[in-house]
Amino acid sequence: EIIGDIPIYMGYDSADVWAESQYFQLNEDRLCEKVAGVPPDAFSDLGQKWGNPLYDWDTLEKDDFSWWYRRMHKSAQLYDVIRIDHFIGIVKYYTIPADMPDARQGEYCMGPGKKLTDVINRAIGDKKIIAEDLGVSVPEVNELLEENNYPGMKVLEFAFGGDRKNPHLPHNYTQNCVVYGGTHDNETLMGYFIEHPDWELGYAYDYLDTRDKERMVDQVFRAAYGSVANLVIFAVQDILKLGNWARMNTPSTLGTNWKWRMKKGELNDSHIKDMRYLASVFGRENS
């Protein structure tokens, strides 16, 4: 199956914003006075100012969210599973003054919530959704996920801070979730364990029952595969046990992002055998 990753927002220079500007928060000169992003979080102390135009949800609703219907219907023709990035933004979205240098001085506004997910469900038919629900915990988001039976996400690199109730720890998972070692915005697993000091990794050492960095990655695989989660996804960089030089993206930076490529032969029969073995042990083979 192919999972298509759908960003919630459009680029300012996209065909959609140019051709259907009535659906976006633009002034009479077609400029953004406020833009999209997220407040400070685990990824960035300054937050993330993405700079995308915000949706004019009132206008979209008056048109029965037809633009979103067309978007999701087309995505369902291309992909088997659709991952909606920043799903929280459907419930409430963060607005940042366009002239601010970072995302610290923004505010939240309410989004369409169930009105939009009803349209999405009609548009995609029998295709499946993964909701990227990371970030600030919002009760309304959890309610919307349950109502639509959308699986949310768990990230193992977020698991070892806090206490034993951390929702990203495998023993706290519910079945209807998708587990990642890290997202495209995270360090690689090997990079995470190498770069972070012992005082940050104390609970990880205990939970994974080892201090050996390479074995810690193996133990993360086992913890995820052995959990009740319906689906487990690891980046190929983690299967190859590469350091942070191979990470996909560092948020709020420019330069080396999205440039890593896997070389021919780098993923070999030994890697495939190991992952197939884990799938067999924990009953995750393809049926």
Q: What residue spans do the PLM features occupy?
A:
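Alpha-amylase-like alpha-glycosidases and glucanotransferases acting on alpha-linked glucans and related
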Residues: 9-233, 237-244, 250-265
